[in-house]
Amino acid sequence: TTPMDSCVLDENGDFSLQAPSPQYPDFYRLRVGNRSLLLAVDSIEAIVVSTTLDSLPYTLSIDGSDASLTIAQLRATARTATREQLREQAQLTIVQNPRSLAAYYAVFLKQGGEYIWDLYNPADRRMYQAVVTSFHTWMPDYERSKALYAQVSSALKAEREIQQQIAMRQLI
């Protein structure tokens, strides 16, 4: 992680940060002490976050980035919901806009230290494939697109190898 900037809060606790627009949408982490908020930043966004230190990152308002708000909601849900409820919310996020950073985040979402989707489970892999297809189509040179494409390709290759081994055993 490369620090983007640091700042001093004014008497009201307000601050502002600016950075050059990224070539591709990307994640930025806003840290305050040991608390952090994950922001999905596109090249044209101005994001306004309203919260208190005690409630960061779970109780807040985010304007200017729907993906950031969705990610915050997914993170809050991961703390309180059942695994199935979290999977349903993550799936909805992916299906509604597989090209968004929120969808990318949703395929790597964890609960209790474990990923909620298994790349090697064909049913779960559909979520990864939806996101990788969108990212690879719209942003083929983006490092996140390339990395996800490689992961999904590797899982598909492993599945084909297993199927070939099973077929060979059945012939013998």
Predicted regions and their residues:
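Amphipathic alpha-helical repeat scaffolds of TPR domains
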Residues: 98-115
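Generic detector of short, well-ordered, non-transmembrane alpha-helical segments enriched
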Residues: 9, 102-103, 131
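Amphipathic alpha-helices of TPR/Sel1-like and other helical repeat/solenoid scaffolds
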Residues: 83-94, 126-138
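A non-transmembrane, solvent-exposed segment enriched in polar/low-complexity residues
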Residues: 1-97
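Residues at alpha-helix boundaries and the short loops/turns that link adjacent helices
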Residues: 96, 100-101, 138, 142
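N-proximal helix/coil linker or "cap" segments that precede and/or mark the start of modular domains
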Residues: 127-172
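Short coil/turn connectors between adjacent alpha-helices in alpha-solenoid helical repeat scaffolds
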Residues: 115-126
